[in-house]
Amino acid sequence: MTIFGESAGAMNCNILCASPMAKGLFRACISQSGAFMSSMSMVTQQQAEMLGSMFVQQLQKSSIEELRAMDAKSLTGTGVNFMACTPIIDGKVLTDEVYRLYELGQYADVPVMLMYNSDEGAVVEIETAEQYKAQMNGLPQNYVDSVLAIYPADTDEQAYYSVRDVVRDLNFGWPAYAWATLQKKTGKSAVYSAYLAQKSDRTVYAKGNRRGAAHADDIMYLNGSFLKEAERYPQEATVSEIMQQYWVNFAKTMNPNGAGLPEWPVYEEGKKTVMQFNNGATLIETPNMVGISLIDRFMQYVRKVKAEASGQ
């Protein structure tokens, strides 16, 4: 079977690829807008137990049995921060950080198709440049300077768009890049990379002032929403039809290519091997690499600090 997910579903696919418990249960993977490649996105068993204890206290319960007895509406309506619910390096489902497992080649080496969208961060809004800059509190100053050079905030309008680009590159662009490049280095199976940049006045979550496809907009293209209104959305319908054909081909054969479609080569860093969906399908180099390169250096710094702190 081919596993397939978007956003949180894509992150789940990434965990399945990295988990020794899931090896052999699927033959290919499609991941759209999500992966747990950052060292900051997972916790150890000890940290998880501490967070779990805090979670129980917030809900004013005293045992797992009491938590299990709660109905879903009561649980989700409590205002509890579920962002602490993150992958756990427990020695079973995950034996190490996902990035490290990919470095070591300890993952399901199956064909993968990875995609994210050009305006993923359009679901995030800030009002002022000061709000944007405040989010960098705690970062080393050299990284703050580099961030502001690439994602400027001289005006509120600049900051409005910069925060969206940071969200896109940090949460979606870099994880896809890290996954693709690491699997190319340590794996043997094909890696296909894609980028949805089609702009439309229809969206799933985002508000106005968008520059391309926002987070979750890819769902509309794959479920055929635009095909039902092709006269009103001709460009979107064209992209939708192309994407559907590629996705079905990959699910069937582990290769997206097929009759009547532009040839989609396997991913090669620094070459035009990323399939961009924008008024059709064309090949480009990895997009947004200036920002992604900065994030890659920062993630190296984070891994180094964590290793030194743990005595590794």
Describe the function of each predicted region.
Residues 243:
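C-terminal catalytic lobe of FAD-dependent flavoproteins
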